[in-house]
């Protein structure tokens, strides 16, 4: 049985990361295993920024967003010498295994450490839901709720002034936040990463709505895919459609806030599952949610998986949300 494990959060923060930390600490404690938190992700691993965690410390973080341990990006971790320093720090502290919470980039580091003798388990922590080997990532539900609430508020004011609004949403190349928000808010026009509309197409569709007498429009777009700002997209749509068109960039508000009950549940139980696997002497695994059940897969296999093709659903939803009658 292992005696000490470490835990770190890497990449962009996501609501629910603290619940995963709590799940690891409480489960490990029940098995007599000590847990050390690594501050600021892989950077803390290389610099030896370790702190001993206990159950009492986790009680105050269950309802908090962000990550108690802090997070930082370290591209240099792909270099062997940097990883060797990290492994030396772990061995010096007597840490035999590691739980890594983050996205795809974090898992590559975890796989390399496993190959160097430190068993690692990866948990999917990102609001983007861009990891193919899990139905939902930790943080996705909370971010979605935050976005939907914001779009509902935007709808109120657009309706009052007969305007359209272009809402830019995060996703890191994955359109799930856009598509799910379109379902939840009835957005008339939406352009997720998987099936982008051109600005001309969005403008012409908006023009059709205006000619039918629709008072307001919500237009959702995935971030960083048009090469211009949301304000510039709005200006172009306004010229084509005739709607007075505003732009809203939700930005980092999507990452913050208290995690929803579902994110807390997914994160905590994933942390429990990770400790159980490490206690069995297993490593190089990724914990994902599949059909409402936690599963463990080899990290290598998860990195090559492709997400389900959502284009048929997106096209069907466009027809439904795009229909308007008085």
Swiss-Prot record:
Listed cofactors: Mg(2+)
Location relative to the cell: Cytoplasm
GO BP terms, alphabetized: canonical glycolysis; fructose 1,6-bisphosphate metabolic process; fructose 6-phosphate metabolic process
Binding sites annotated in the UniProt record for ADP: 155, 186-188, 214-216
Entry GO CC: 6-phosphofructokinase complex
Pathway: Carbohydrate degradation; glycolysis; D-glyceraldehyde 3-phosphate and glycerone phosphate from D-glucose: step 3/4
Active site: 128
Chain residues that bind ATP: 12, 73-74, 103-106
Database matches in InterPro entries: ATP_PFK, ATP_PFK_prok-type, PFKA_ATP_prok, Phosphofructokinase_CS, Phosphofructokinase_dom, PKF_sf
Alphabetized SUPFAM superfamilies for the sequence: Phosphofructokinase
Catalytic activity line of the entry: beta-D-fructose 6-phosphate + ATP = beta-D-fructose 1,6-bisphosphate + ADP + H(+)
Binding site for Mg(2+): 104
Molecular function terms from GO: 6-phosphofructokinase activity; AMP binding; ATP binding; fructose-6-phosphate binding; identical protein binding; metal ion binding; monosaccharide binding
Catalytic EC class: transferase
Cited function: Catalyzes the phosphorylation of D-fructose 6-phosphate to fructose 1,6-bisphosphate by ATP, the first committing step of glycolysis.
Family according to the record: Belongs to the phosphofructokinase type A (PFKA) family. ATP-dependent PFK group I subfamily. Prokaryotic clade 'B1' sub-subfamily.
Subunit structure: Homotetramer.
Name by which UniProt lists this protein: ATP-dependent 6-phosphofructokinase
Lineage: Bacteria, Bacillati, Mycoplasmatota, Mollicutes, Mycoplasmataceae
């Amino acid at each position: 049985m292992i005696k000490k494990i470490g835990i770190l959060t890497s990449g962009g923060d996501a609501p629910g990361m603290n619940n995963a930390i709590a799940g690891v600490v409480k489960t490990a404690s029940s098995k007599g295993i000590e847990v050390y938190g690594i501050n600021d992700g892989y950077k803390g691993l290389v610099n030896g920024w370790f702190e001993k965690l206990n159950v009492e410390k986790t009680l105050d973080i269950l309802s908090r967003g962000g990550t108690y341990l802090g997070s930082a990006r370290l591209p240099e971790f792909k270099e062997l010498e940097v990883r060797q320093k990290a492994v030396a720090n772990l061995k010096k502290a007597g840490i035999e295994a590691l739980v890594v919470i983050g996205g795809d980039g974090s898992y590559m580091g975890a796989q390399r450490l496993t190959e160097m003798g430190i068993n690692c388990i990866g948990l999917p922590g990102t609001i983007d839901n861009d990891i193919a080997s899990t139905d939902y990532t930790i943080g996705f539900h909370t971010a979605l709720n935050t976005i939907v609430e914001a779009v509902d508020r935007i709808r109120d004011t657009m309706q009052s002034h007969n305007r359209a609004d272009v809402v830019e949403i995060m996703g890191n190349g994955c359109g799930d936040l856009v598509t799910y928000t379109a379902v939840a808010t009835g957005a008339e026009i939406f352009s997720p990463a998987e099936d982008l509309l051109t600005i001309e197409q969005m403008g012409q569709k908006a023009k059709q709505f205006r000619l039918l007498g629709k008072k307001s429009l919500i237009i959702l777009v995935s971030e960083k895919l048009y090469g211009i700002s949301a304000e510039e997209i709005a200006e172009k749509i306004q010229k084509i459609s005739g709607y007075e068109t505003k732009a809203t960039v939700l930005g980092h508000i999507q990452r913050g806030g208290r995690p929803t009950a579902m994110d807390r549940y997914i994160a905590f139980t994933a942390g429990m599952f990770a400790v159980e696997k490490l206690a069995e002497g297993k490593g190089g695994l990724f914990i994902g949610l599949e059909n409402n059940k936690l599963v463990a897969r080899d990290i290598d296999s998860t990195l090559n998986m492709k997400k389900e093709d959502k284009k048929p659903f997106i096209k069907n939803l466009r027809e439904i949300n795009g229909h308007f009658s008085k």
